Design a protein with these regions (language model features):
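His/acidic metal-ligating clusters that form di-metal
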Residues: 1-56, 89-94
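Binuclear metal-dependent phosphoesterase catalytic core
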Residues: 46-98
Length: 98
């Protein structure tokens, strides 16, 4: 099981230079490494980027600056819950691990 933590998420090629430069430098290595999921922040808003959305071989969860992500990993899957300050679950994602 491989979980990557990166502050700045990758972008589709439009937008801020930093996102695109990190994508150019790191995405090929992470794709080759067999990453199961990548967790990010930086944008201060939630998003979930499916496999292939930014040439990625793994899903990317981007969390906001006001919520937390609870991650539970087993041999077969990674469960992620995005939870707000009141404890309400806003989003759930499960990634199967091979």
């Amino acid at each position: 099981m491989k979980i990557a933590l990166l502050h700045i998420p990758f972008d589709k090629g439009v937008g801020w230079y930093g996102n695109n430069e990190l994508k150019r430098l790191l995405l090929p290595t992470l794709n080759e490494a067999g990453i199961d999921v990548m967790l990010c922040g930086h944008t201060h808003r939630y998003s979930f980027r499916d496999v292939g959305s930014v040439d990625n071989n793994f899903p990317i969860l981007v969390n906001s600056n006001n919520d937390k992500v609870n991650v539970r990993a087993t041999k077969s899957q990674i469960d992620m819950e995005v939870v707000d300050a009141t404890g309400k679950v806003l989003h759930r994602h499960t990634v199967k691990v091979e």
